[in-house]
Curated annotation (Swiss-Prot):
Record-level Gene Ontology MF annotations: translation elongation factor activity
Organism: Mycoplasma pneumoniae (strain ATCC 29342 / M129 / Subtype 1)
Listed CDD domains: S1_EF-P_repeat_1
Keyword annotations: Cytoplasm, Elongation factor, Protein biosynthesis
Record-linked InterPro entries: Elong-fact-P_C (IPR015365), NA-bd_OB-fold (IPR012340), Rib_uL2_dom2 (IPR014722), Transl_elong_fac_P/YeiP (IPR020599), Transl_elong_KOW-like (IPR013185), Transl_elong_P/YeiP_cen (IPR001059), Transl_elong_P/YeiP_CS (IPR013852), Transl_elongation_fac_P (IPR011768)
Annotated PROSITE patterns: EFP (PS01275)
Protein name: Elongation factor P
Top-rank lineage group of the source organism: Bacteria
One GO cellular component term noted in the UniProt record for this chain: cytoplasm
Family stated for the protein in its record: Belongs to the elongation factor P family.
A GO biological process held by the record: peptide biosynthetic process
Metabolic or biological pathway: Protein biosynthesis; polypeptide chain elongation
UniProt xrefs under SUPFAM superfamilies: Nucleic acid-binding proteins, Translation proteins SH3-like domain
Entry-linked HAMAP family: EF_P
Amino acid sequence: MADMIEAKSLRSGQTIFGPNKEILLVLENTFNKTAMRQGIVKTKVKNLRTGAIVWIEFTGDKLEQVIIDKKKMTFLYKDGANYVFMDQQDYSQIEIPEKQLEWEKNFITEDSEVTIISYQSEILGVNLPELVPIEVEFAEEAVQGNTANMARKRARLVSGYELDVPQFIRTGDKIVISTIDGSYRERYNK
């Protein structure tokens, strides 16, 4: 039997089983106690199977913690509708369907290091580093005279993701991108 935890003791980053045995990652947790009632715990969670983010209320509940496995792997290649990753320790490979990587695929390139999250043998998702360097496949030409504060132009990365970048970025440059919101952070210097 897995460890049980009181709802009011939940912390960001913990994983629990939800009311319908879904695997939930705790994002935020607030505990409100009034004089005449039992405390209410409002918890913002992400369903690791569906990706849905919702608020759930608990009242004095004991919840079952879920022990998830995290394994560092390297992206090798895309095979049709699947992304293939390899464990650098034992060279085992796994395939993850593209539909399970809707956001993450924008930042995965050859040799990208990721953390695969699983429960028992079920792949739940991929964690990316917060910032990743990635090459610009195409950048629009800078418009001469357009030097207003924070002038931007469109660019497409080698992954196919499009975003706004500063005017000085050119095709072939490597830039650092936030995997949280997909925004440009800086020119990659290495």
